Amino acid sequence: MIDDVDTAFENARTFIAHFAPDLVVMFAPDHYNGVYYDLMPPFCIGAAAQSVGDYGTEAGPLDVDRDAAYTVAREVLSSGVDVAFSERMHVDHGFAQALQLLVGSITAVPTVPIFINSVAEPLGPVSRVRLLGEAVGRAAANLDKRVLFVGSGGLSHDPPVPQFATAPAEVKEKLIDGRNPTEAERNAREKRVIDAGRDFAAGVATIAPLNPQWDRTLLDVLASGYLEQVDSWTNESFVEQAGHSSHEVRTWIAAYAAMSVAGKYRVTSTFYREIPEWIAGFGITTAVSIDE
């Protein structure tokens, strides 16, 4: 399985190297490492961003294109999509891991990081995510750059991420403001997730199962280009069919919606595996505009 994933990433890296982007616009979630309930926006664009370095990812500042970030933010706001804006965004493996695996490091290519809340209820309708992506796509079209859109997040999965409504008081406080954990606290948290993955693979975990059929349906919808189909998907249906963290596919929807602004596109590769050890339906796709 690891060899298959490594090959899929190598193919994606080759695709990106051939495209040679001037800018990466990345849509990604957070896992209560950078954004908390003390102020939880549905979307946030970063003009500067710092990776916290969780799960062994690279820590430190991303190479953020501030001018492009401001341009994107203005277009999104003028399109009627309310988006937060940050000059000091903190991001986790949702951003950093994808950048490292796809382009080599968090500073390899200038980036505009766009956070999409995918775990902290209440969540907005999926249609707003699509509209966000389209607005970002319109902004990118005016940048005079070769722009790579990346959506980073799991497919069906239900890892042990606490839900605010049911969490004990001490956990709620961490969800409200758990910034700057000690190394021991971060290690313990990551160990809980890794242990849950082992239990899940062994069939003894009490979390929701993966749903390959749901995952493949989503990938088919994204490949079809008819993204309005997701507008009818309720937030509850995500959780019921694919687990609480399946909302991370909002990043995929936004990335494909951004690409759709340039016209029809073609998916050039699709990789999918059901990986219980990672508590995730795992996918990698690449796509190009028909005119590319």
PLM segments and residue spans:
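Glycine-centered flexibility sites
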Residues: 133, 151-153, 281
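Beta-strand elements within well-structured catalytic alpha/beta cores of enzymes
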Residues: 22-28, 114, 145-155
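Phosphate/ribose-phosphate-bearing ligand recognition and processing surfaces
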Residues: 154-163
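Flexible, D/E/H-enriched segments
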Residues: 1-21, 37-131, 142, 162-292
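Short active-site-proximal "capping" loops at secondary-structure junctions
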Residues: 30-33
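Non-transmembrane, aqueous-exposed alpha-helical and coiled segments at domain scale
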Residues: 134-142, 147
